[in-house]
């Protein structure tokens, strides 16, 4: 079967989805929620370095895309749980595999970066200063 041409609108649609699910914070949140529902502060503690605002934006985006549900329990104080939807659970396995791959190859990537940086750092230029 010959390859089908890509429509610009299809590429833009896929790009917007990949921008959401490929975002580093989304990847961490999806990986965590794969183990079951979690509360906001629990997610924040487990995802090191994420601000409250960024976690809020990430969860809202995932909820908007139908990947996460937000359940408010009528308790005092209110309890809010986040969990993956069926659609989100379908994404969990590839995201988990991506996270595992990154973890397994972290040292190799860091070595490659260091080699690249050494090859591409500007050479020290001699200074033409006159000693006084």
Residue ranges with predicted function:
Residues 1-9, 64, 69, 86-132:
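C-terminal regulatory/oligomerization modules of transcriptional regulators
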Residues 3, 7-54, 81, 89:
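N-terminal helix-turn-helix DNA-binding core of bacterial DNA-binding proteins
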Residues 35, 75, 86:
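Active-site acidic-Proline motif in GNAT/NAT acetyltransferases
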Residues 55, 59-62:
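Basic amphipathic alpha-helical segments that dock to polyanions
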Residues 63-83:
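Beta-hairpin "wing" of winged helix-turn-helix
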């Amino acid at each position: 079967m010959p390859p089908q041409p890509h429509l610009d609108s299809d590429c833009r649609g896929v790009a917007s989805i990949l921008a959401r699910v490929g975002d580093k914070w989304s990847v961490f949140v999806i990986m965590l929620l794969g183990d079951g529902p979690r509360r906001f502060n629990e997610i924040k503690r487990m995802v090191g370095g994420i601000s409250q605002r960024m976690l809020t934006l990430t969860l809202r985006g995932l909820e908007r895309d139908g990947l996460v549900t937000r359940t408010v329990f009528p308790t005092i104080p209110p309890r809010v749980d986040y969990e993956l939807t069926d659609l989100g659970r379908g994404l969990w396995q590839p995201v988990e595999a991506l996270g595992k791959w990154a973890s397994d190859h972290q040292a190799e990537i860091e070595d490659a970066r260091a080699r690249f940086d050494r090859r591409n750092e500007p050479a020290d230029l001699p200074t033409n200063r006159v000693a006084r």
